[in-house]
From Swiss-Prot:
Lineage: Eukaryota, Viridiplantae, Chlorophyta, core chlorophytes, Chlorophyceae
Gene Ontology annotations of biological process type: photosynthesis
Family according to the record: Belongs to the PsaJ family.
Annotated protein name in UniProt: Photosystem I reaction center subunit IX
Membrane topology: Single-pass membrane protein
Disulfide partners: none
Record keywords, A-Z: Chloroplast, Membrane, Photosynthesis, Photosystem I, Plastid, Thylakoid, Transmembrane, Transmembrane helix
Keyword Protein transport applies: no
Keyword Membrane carried by entry: yes
GO-annotated cellular components: chloroplast thylakoid membrane; photosystem I
Its job: May help in the organization of the PsaE and PsaF subunits.
Main subcellular localisation: plastid
Transmembrane feature ranges: 7-27
Length: 41
């Protein structure tokens, strides 16, 4: 049971860090290589 509670306390932390990293990476890619769906005249 101790291992299960440890898993429940660490999985959300790892998921939050991973999603933050992925979102930041996508933002930086779209900054340098803009999405062609957005046209800025």
């Amino acid at each position: 049971m101790k291992d299960f509670t440890t898993y429940l306390s660490t999985a959300p932390v790892i998921a939050t860090i991973w999603f933050t990293f992925t979102a930041g990476l996508l933002i930086e890619i779209n900054r340098y290589f803009p999405d062609p769906l957005v046209f800025s005249f």
